[in-house]
């Protein structure tokens, strides 16, 4: 593996470990960002289950004409994920930015999820 990949993998492990310590039984809102799309899941780490998920690749998102690689798509994914999580009875989560900087698409997704009813 290249040095950059190893560094990113270690950063991800470090972030997840600190989140597990501070979670207190709350599910984790995990974000994955690629160059073309953005994905988010609410995960219960104790059971190993995904409770809610949303991505910019879903039919609802693709029909709106967004590319998935911009801030508007991230906001739409955050709103959709929060609606699904609240419907499943989840109000509080721990935000796992996955080693990405809290800026741009990651920040837009988090803000939209907060506005739609999730607290973290």
Swiss-Prot record:
Gene Ontology biological process terms, A to Z: translation
Gene3D superfamilies referenced in this protein's UniProt entry, alphabetically: 3.30.420.100
GO MF annotation terms: 5S rRNA binding; structural constituent of ribosome
CC per GO annotation: cytosolic large ribosomal subunit
Pfam families according to UniProt: Ribosomal_L18p
Keywords from the named record: Ribonucleoprotein, Ribosomal protein, RNA-binding, rRNA-binding
Keyword Hydrolase attributed: no
Functional description taken from the UniProt entry: This is one of the proteins that bind and probably mediate the attachment of the 5S RNA into the large ribosomal subunit, where it forms part of the central protuberance.
UniProt similarity note: Belongs to the universal ribosomal protein uL18 family.
Quaternary structure, from the entry: Part of the 50S ribosomal subunit; part of the 5S rRNA/L5/L18/L25 subcomplex. Contacts the 5S and 23S rRNAs.
Protein name per Swiss-Prot or TrEMBL: Large ribosomal subunit protein uL18
Annotated organism of origin: Bradyrhizobium sp. (strain BTAi1 / ATCC BAA-1182)
Name of encoding gene: rplR
